[in-house]
Amino acid sequence: MAKNKKAEAKAAKDLKQGDLKAARDTQEATVGLKWLGDVAEHDFAAAEAYLSLRLDPTQVDDAGKHLRSAKVTTRRANDILRASNRDPLPLDDPGVMRDLRKAISGEKLSPVLVVTLPQGADIADGYHRVSLAYNLNPFGDVPLRIASELRKK
């Protein structure tokens, strides 16, 4: 137990000093990401706010309903990023660092929300969490809900 506390303290110190490579190496060895069993309620509102920038209101409502009724499943971090045509954010991104601090403290992260659109998949909520997971282990499983079959405009 003391060994984990020392590793966590070293990781936090490395992170504070900006030595992100050392922090990442330490995290890979000592901290596995822990996930909530289901999506936090506020994440649905965040997903709908993001989707309102990309879709019309009817589609946003449809996506929200599909996301709320979808079951939690898992996909590898690299596959989520590849399907959404996104690159992972670096560990020094403020949102990724916030989630890394949560992981170091043992806090569970909320599953991700993904929608499939005619132009491909998109991460409606949880891009920072997927990026963190990818940076720690690109092939690690990330829990998510997927909404598909949205009405076309």
Label for each model-derived stretch:
Residues 2, 23, 53, 67-70, ...:
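Short, intrinsically disordered low-complexity segments
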Residues 2-59:
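N-terminal extension/subdomain marker
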Residues 6-14, 18, 65-122, 135:
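Short alpha-helix boundary/capping and kink motifs at helix termini
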Residues 27, 109-153:
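A short, basic-hydrophobic beta/loop patch
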Residues 31, 39, 60, 72, ...:
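Extended aliphatic helical segments
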Residues 45-47, 56, 62, 67, ...:
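Generic alpha-helix signal with a bias toward terminal, lower-confidence helices
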Residues 53-58, 88-94, 147:
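Short, structured coil/loop segments at alpha-helix boundaries
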